[in-house]
Regions:
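Active-site catalytic motif of lipid deacylating hydrolases and related acyltransferases
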Residues: 1-53
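Glycosyltransferases and closely related glycan-assembly transferases
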Residues: 70-76
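Local beta-strand N-terminus motif with an aromatic residue
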Residues: 1, 56, 138, 197-198
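Residue in the alpha/beta-hydrolase core beta-strand immediately N-terminal to the catalytic nucleophile
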Residues: 57-60, 76-78
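The alpha/beta-hydrolase serine catalytic core
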Residues: 76-196
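Gly/Ala-rich beta-loop-alpha elbow adjacent to hydrolase catalytic centers
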Residues: 60-70
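Short hydrophobic segments within beta-strands
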Residues: 6-10, 60, 142-144, 202-203
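Alpha-helical substrate-recognition element adjacent to the catalytic core
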Residues: 199-212
Length: 212
C-alpha cells in the first residue's frame, strides 16, 4: 500500500476524526499524522522533517494544513479548503481557544494573540513561491462552494491549474471525501503507477437537450 501524510487544521491535532475517516476509506494505505506546533516557523520545520523522514506518496492537508502542504514541495499533494490567509482567518478568533482534538503534549487550549496572528500573516507570504510547471501538476486544490471560513479558490487558481470546486462547506466530511477526495487520490495513484484511466468529459450542453 501507499503512504499518506495528513496535515491537520488549526486547533486540531493528529487525533482528528479526519485521520480515522481517511484510514477507513483507504484501508490499504498507511496514514501518518503528527501534532503541528502552534508557531508557524516551528510548524513548517517539523512538517518538512517529517516529510523527509516518512517519504509519503501523497500529502493531504486541510485548512491551515492545506496552507502548510503547499510549501512541502517535491511531493504529490492535495489541499482541501486551504487557509492561505491564516492571519485573516484567525483575526476573528482572538482570546482563549480550545483544541478540538487531544494533543500529545496535553495542551488543550491556546491563547490567540495579536502577535500570533501577525506570525501567521507574515508566514503565509511564503506561499506560492518558485512554482515550477512540474509542481503545478503535482498540487490539487479542493474548495467547498459553501465554505463560510476560507475563500481561496481564486488565489490558488492563479498559481495552480488543478483547482476543483465541490459542493460542501469547510470541514472534510465523509461524503465529500468519498465523492471528491477519493477520485483525486485515484488519479494521482494511477499517475504514480504509470496507468491512465480513460476520462470522459461531458459538457453541460451535451446533457442540456429536450429532456432538461
Amino acid at each position: 500500500g501507499k503512504k499518506i501524510m495528513y496535515v491537520h487544521g488549526f486547533l486540531s491535532s493528529a487525533q482528528s476524526g479526519t485521520v480515522k475517516m481517511l484510514q477507513e476509506l483507504m484501508p490499504n494505505a498507511t496514514l501518518v499524522a503528527e501534532d503541528i506546533p502552534v508557531h508557524p516557523e516551528e510548524g513548517i520545520e517539523m512538517l518538512q522533517k517529517m516529510a523527509e523522514t516518512e517519504k509519503p506518496d501523497l500529502i493531504i492537508g486541510t485548512s491551515m494544513g492545506g496552507m502548510y502542504t503547499e510549501l512541502l514541495k517535491g511531493f504529490d499533494r492535495i489541499l482541501v479548503n486551504p487557509a492561505f490567509k491564516m492571519g485573516d482567518t484567525m483575526s476573528s478568533m482572538t482570546g482563549k481557544q480550545e483544541f478540538q482534538n487531544p494533543r500529545k503534549d496535553g495542551v488543550n487550549e491556546l491563547m490567540v494573540t495579536k502577535g500570533l496572528i501577525k506570525e501567521y500573516r507574515d508566514f503565509t507570504e511564503r506561499c506560492f513561491q518558485d512554482i515550477t510547471p512540474e509542481e503545478q501538476q503535482r498540487v490539487y486544490g479542493l474548495f467547498g462552494d459553501a465554505d463560510p471560513l476560507v475563500h481561496t479558490f481564486d488565489l490558488f487558481h492563479e498559481h495552480y491549474p488543478l483547482a476543483i470546486p465541490f459542493h460542501g462547506e469547510h470541514r472534510l466530511i465523509d461524503k465529500v471525501a468519498f465523492h471528491y477526495l477519493c477520485p483525486v487520490i485515484r488519479w494521482i495513484d494511477d499517475k504514480q503507477n504509470g496507468k491512465e484511466r480513460p476520462i470522459v468529459y461531458i459538457d453541460f450542453d451535451a446533457l442540456h437537450d429536450s429532456y432538461m
